[in-house]
């Protein structure tokens, strides 16, 4: 990959052997947003002309675009070294050198930016190379360049480095999923944002070609390393990847505690990966600052005071956000708090305990307090924490994948370790937790790890601690010799003292500048906006394709039947006709059936669910469906899934099978904080032609008052259900979510039962918990439900129509529901009186509009529109400015993008130009586009000056038609004037102006502008070279089909009118504009 430059018109290009990604400069006003035009093209279609190499180095990709001091810079990686190889084809590189090339200015073209040499050893601290010397001081990108090349940034060309192994098992770099990358750990997200948006505008073939070029590079900050060694007869790779969060990034004393969004300082996800030819194992743990609002001054010599800045009540929201996101991402959380008993650290620990006790997630949060300084005197003392964490370590498990890429075991839960800075003490304990995990792996794989293995493990963890400490404090980690060698020494103590002095200096004198550079990289400075990437050709083509969709697509309607039943563990039966085949309901094309409590939720079933019951019900449902098909194709089972007692099965007509593809299934546990499958959801998705459908059945937390826990179950399922390539349930055209939601009616048994008997369902629905939670937006946003016209479906005495008569007297409720999202057409929603369970089954019918795209027709139309638009651009001009302008109107095409994309900066309007004004809505043109019906027509001077005043006068009149209003009659009586001699021109004109018998005196306040009252005149010509220069020639007023016109007056108003007419020798070329 190379970076090329064209100077006139200025453009940059990233080029490989087949394609080019070009960035064209755009003229900008002082207060306008930063904009450049992007273009992706095949070199075979558009050879690069006028480009030259701007760098002799290999380019590894671009980190994105950023605006600095009015210049738009393209940042490219020009130096890198391989530091890790997670698996055979998964390499990790450290960024060693970056270059900033201006898209719109040549000021820095002469500066040589590359300092990195592949001969520099990987451990060399590039921060000390002195690149920021006096000759670079004037560069606007110098601080960013120094940050990006300090050895703490990493990238991969082979896999998504922002995501841990357990979540990226279904991803392949043949089709990178930029939208699913973990932006929390993506440090160049701000710079790359517009490039990813540009990618989304491309068609399928172009997008695949762009992905194959690897032009875009996602960078993390933290640490990555791999050590290879022998374990028995196997070759093993031990890799460590630490990903530092960018959401509350900063330096030691300027970034503490939590923010209002729940993001904590120095949050790091560390993944230990063990890879061999037979398996690949991964284990994740995290660290982060105490999630409360606290600060600490860094200018004191010793004993920096800790200041808790918000009350317990004011901190709860942020605390809950932090742990809610952790639980949704990793499962249950075990906190290892290493703070001591000093006054400052003790106050943080006390506040942490208070928040955990008040948290609604307290059952999913375990706390272990371990005073590191008082407990640990040697490495062996660190083992004191083992009994405190071993139980959860076994429960959480690890991710295990066989050599065929199949997931055998998954990690459910995470250890969260913290001390004050989350550096030195944290690194020692995380090293121990990682060792506990690896010991479990050795037992699982029946292998033995010797001394050399553990020594390599300790060394790689010590290097990790040094790298993270250098990022946060500017120096390496304290106690690193303790981590490496397992003991304290005098040399290690002296080294720690030296680092402490270095930290004090850096914190007091350098942190502010480092913080500003970090904020600049992340796009967090005041009034900082991303560089807008404009792609007018694809914008136009995609807009036209949407308008002409019917030319390459077909539509048909498909009937869908959705049914849900909580079986309460009852046996399978075929007596389900009333449920699956209601009266006056035609057979559907697709049947979606969900069961809850298909088995009794005993501990044995929860641990290992028996699929036999599910198969029995599948057989019963399929037999019933095919029994109804007396003629024509029958029904086949498309797919089924089970999570303990929750089961989902989908049946479709055989005739539908050729249209269905990409069938996938997944599950999400929510019971016991995601560890147990007694509660949770099962989901199946597929594509019907080119329409995506997703069906979810779920069983949420029980309990009359546990609606908060049910809300949490919804959020866990909504965020945790993931299909291949990072697809979520919301990435579909139609979604149906149904099952036993367990939401109750907030009334008493004595109030509800009489209302049911009296048919007061609307009154009861006002107290329905799900209805209330949906109205407040807490659950199921953008989902809909048909009006409920049936009585509550829970809880009955089995075999009767009588609601619960047991001692508990459970309040009847609509626990069983069916919700939908998308433009489905609902037809019915009912319950059915089946008596096998304490629930009543429900069903709903829908009709879905299915779109089938003829890809060949779409491709032909795309190419036709694309080539047509490119030709229009080429005909208009060769400059990139016209590309911007061309997006508005070329050859009468509509203005597709009247304003630049807002991207959070709606207050800044596009600057006005000759063609557009910012105060005109919807991109209306600045000049009127009204034109006379033909060349023989002109504007009617008799119309009132106020365009809103009612009048019978037409807008246009013929050139041959005489106007008989008062002014035109007076003008018609003026005889034609003969040219005066040049020497008498001035006096002649003067005498004409003073003679009322020849020219009437103009009123002080004219009722119409001059250029509407006066007919066209022949413009005054400058004297020829042979004429006298002592005077101005008299005007030639020879009329052409119009009455004669008085000579031009000297008033500024009439002079401007004369200039307007003089600039258009042909009347048809005048930009006609109504007066306002």
UniProtKB/Swiss-Prot annotation:
What name goes with this protein? Inositol-1,4,5-trisphosphate 5-phosphatase 1
The family line of this record is:
Belongs to the synaptojanin family. In the central section; belongs to the inositol 1,4,5-trisphosphate 5-phosphatase family.
Q: Which Gene3D superfamilies match?
A: Endonuclease/exonuclease/phosphatase (3.60.10.10)
State the organism of origin. Answer: Schizosaccharomyces pombe (strain 972 / ATCC 24843)
Description of pH dependence? Optimum pH is about 7.4.
> Do the record's keywords include Cell division?
no
Q: Could you tell me which residue ranges the SAC domain spans?
A: 144-474
The record's listing under CDD domains reads: INPP5c_ScInp51p-like (cd09090)
Look up the EC number in the record and give it: 3.1.3.36
The record's listing under PROSITE patterns reads:
SAC
- Bias class Polar residues marks the residues at 1065-1076
* Region annotated Catalytic, chain positions: 534-880
The record's function comment reads: Controls the cellular levels and subcellular distribution of phosphatidylinositol 3-phosphate and phosphatidylinositol 4,5-bisphosphate. Involved in distinct membrane trafficking and signal transduction pathways. Highly active against a range of soluble and lipid inositol phosphates. Active in dephosphorylating the 5-position of Ins(1,4,5)P3 and Ins(1,3,4,5)P4 and to a lesser extent Ins(1,4,5,6)P4. The enzyme is also active against PI(4,5)P2 presented in sonicated vesicles and Triton mixed micelles, and somewhat less active against PI(3,5)P2 in unilamellar vesicles.
Q: Which reaction is recorded as catalysed by this protein?
A: a 1,2-diacyl-sn-glycero-3-phospho-(1D-myo-inositol-4,5-bisphosphate) + H2O = a 1,2-diacyl-sn-glycero-3-phospho-(1D-myo-inositol 4-phosphate) + phosphate
Tell me the enzyme class: hydrolase
């Amino acid at each position: 990959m190379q970076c090329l430059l064209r100077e006139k018109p200025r453009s940059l290009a990233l080029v490989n052997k087949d394609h080019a990604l070009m960035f064209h400069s755009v003229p900008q006003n002082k207060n306008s947003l930063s904009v450049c035009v992007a273009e992706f093209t095949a070199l075979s279609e558009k050879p690069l002309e006028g480009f030259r190499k701007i760098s002799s180095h290999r380019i590894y990709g671009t980190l994105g675009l950023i605006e600095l001091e009015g210049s738009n810079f393209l940042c490219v990686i020009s130096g890198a070294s391989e530091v890790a190889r997670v698996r055979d084809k998964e390499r990790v590189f450290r960024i060693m050198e970056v270059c900033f090339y201006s898209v719109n200015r040549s000021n820095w073209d002469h500066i040589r930016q590359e300092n990195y040499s592949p001969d520099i050893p990987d451990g060399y601290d590039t921060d000390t190379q002195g690149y920021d010397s006096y000759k670079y001081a004037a560069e606007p990108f110098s601080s960013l360049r120094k940050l990006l090349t300090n050895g703490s940034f990493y990238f991969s060309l082979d896999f998504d480095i922002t995501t841990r192994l357990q979540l990226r098992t279904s991803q392949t770099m043949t089709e990178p999923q930029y939208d699913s990358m973990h932006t929390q750990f993506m440090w160049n997200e701000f710079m790359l944002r517009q490039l990813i948006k540009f990618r989304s505008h491309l068609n399928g073939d172009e997008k695949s070609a762009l992905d194959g070029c690897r032009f875009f590079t996602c960078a993390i900050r933290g640490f990555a390393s791999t050590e290879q060694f022998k374990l028995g007869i196997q070759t093993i790779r031990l890799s460590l990847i630490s990903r530092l969060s960018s959401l509350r990034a900063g330096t030691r004393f300027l970034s503490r505690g939590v923010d209002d969004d729940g993001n904590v300082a120095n949050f790091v996800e560390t993944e230990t990966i063990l890879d061999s030819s037979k398996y690949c194992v991964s284990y994740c743990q995290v660290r982060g600052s105490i999630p409360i609002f606290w600060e600490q001054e860094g200018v004191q010599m010793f004993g920096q005071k800790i200041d808790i800045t918000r009350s317990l009540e004011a901190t709860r929201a942020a605390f809950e956000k932090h742990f809610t996101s952790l639980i949704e991402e990793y499962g249950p959380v075990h906190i290892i708090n290493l703070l001591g008993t000093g006054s400052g650290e003790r106050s943080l620990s006390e506040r942490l305990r208070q928040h955990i006790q008040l948290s609604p997630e307290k059952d999913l949060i375990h706390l272990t307090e371990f005073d590191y300084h008082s407990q640990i005197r040697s490495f062996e003392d660190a083992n004191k924490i083992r009994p405190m964490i071993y139980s959860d370590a076994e429960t959480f498990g690890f991710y295990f994948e066989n050599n065929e890429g199949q997931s055998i075991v998954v990690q459910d839960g995470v250890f969260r370790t913290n001390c004050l800075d989350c550096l030195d003490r944290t690194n020692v304990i995380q090293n121990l937790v990682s060792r506990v995990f690896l010991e479990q792996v050795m037992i699982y794989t029946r292998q033995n790890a010797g001394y050399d293995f553990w020594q390599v493990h300790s060394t790689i963890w010590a290097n990790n601690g040094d790298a993270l400490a250098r990022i946060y404090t500017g120096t390496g980690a304290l106690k690193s010799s303790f981590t490496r060698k397992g003991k304290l020494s005098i040399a290690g103590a002296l080294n720690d003292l030296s680092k402490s002095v270095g930290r004090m200096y850096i914190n007091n004198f350098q942190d502010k500048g480092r913080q500003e550079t970090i904020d600049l990289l992340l796009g967090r400075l005041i009034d900082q906006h991303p560089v807008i990437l404009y792609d007018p050709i694809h914008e136009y083509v995609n807009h036209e394709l949407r308008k002409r969709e019917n030319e390459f697509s077909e539509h048909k309607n498909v009937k869908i039947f959705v049914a849900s039943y909580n079986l309460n563990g009852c046996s399978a039966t075929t007596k389900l006709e009333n449920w699956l085949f209601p009266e006056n309901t035609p057979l559907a094309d697709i049947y979606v059936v969900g069961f809850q409590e298909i088995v009794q939720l005993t501990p044995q079933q929860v641990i290992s669910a028996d699929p036999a019951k599910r198969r029995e019900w599948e057989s019963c449902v399929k037999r019933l469906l095919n029994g109804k098909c007396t003629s024509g194709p029958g029904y086949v089972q498309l797919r089924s899934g089970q999570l303990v007692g929750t089961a989902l099965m989908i049946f479709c007509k055989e005739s539908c099978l050729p249209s269905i593809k990409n069938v996938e299934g997944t599950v999400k546990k929510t019971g016991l904080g995601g560890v147990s499958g007694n509660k949770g959801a099962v989901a199946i998705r597929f594509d019907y032609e080119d329409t995506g459908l997703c069906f979810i059945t779920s069983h949420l937390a029980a309990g009359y008052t546990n609606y908060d826990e049910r809300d949490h179950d919804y959020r866990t399922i909504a965020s945790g259900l993931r299909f291949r390539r990072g697809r979520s349930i919301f990435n579909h055209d139609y979604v149906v979510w149904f099952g036993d939601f367990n939401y109750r009616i907030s009334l008493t048994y004595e109030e509800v039962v009489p209302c049911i008997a009296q048919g007061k369902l609307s009154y009861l629905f006002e107290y329905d918990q799900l209805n209330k939670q949906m109205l407040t937006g807490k659950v199921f946003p953008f989902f809909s439900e048909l009006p409920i016209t049936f009585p509550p479906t829970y809880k009955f005495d089995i075999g009767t129509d009588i609601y619960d008569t047991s001692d508990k007297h459970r309040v009847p409720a609509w626990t069983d529901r069916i919700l939908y999202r998308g433009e489905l057409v609902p037809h019915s929603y009912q319950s059915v009186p089946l008596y096998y369970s304490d629930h009543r089954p429900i069903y709903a019918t829908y009709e879905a509009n299915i779109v089938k795209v003829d890809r060949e027709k779409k491709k032909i139309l795309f190419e036709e529109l694309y080539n047509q638009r490119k030709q229009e651009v080429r005909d208009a001009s060769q400059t990139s400015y016209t590309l911007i302008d061309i997006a508005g109107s070329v050859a009468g095409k509509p203005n597709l993008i009247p304003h630049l994309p807002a991207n959070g900066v709606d207050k800044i309007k596009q600057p006005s130009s000759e063609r557009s004004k910012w105060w005109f809505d919807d991109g209306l043109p600045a000049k009127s586009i009204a034109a006379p019906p033909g060349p023989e027509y002109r504007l009617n001077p008799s119309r009132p000056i106020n365009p809103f005043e009612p009048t019978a006068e037409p807008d246009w009149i013929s050139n041959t038609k005489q106007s008989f209003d008062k002014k035109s009659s007076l003008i018609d009586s003026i005889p034609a004037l003969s040219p005066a001699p040049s020497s008498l021109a001035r006096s002649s004109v003067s005498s004409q102006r003073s003679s009322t018998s020849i020219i009437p005196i103009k009123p002080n306040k004219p009722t119409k502008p001059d250029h509407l009252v006066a007919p066209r005149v022949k413009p005054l010509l400058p004297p020829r070279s042979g004429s006298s220069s002592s005077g101005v020639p008299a005007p030639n007023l020879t009329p052409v089909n119009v009455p004669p016109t008085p000579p031009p007056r000297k008033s500024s108003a009439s002079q401007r009118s004369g200039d307007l007419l003089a600039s258009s020798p042909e009347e048809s070329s005048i930009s006609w504009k109504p007066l306002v």
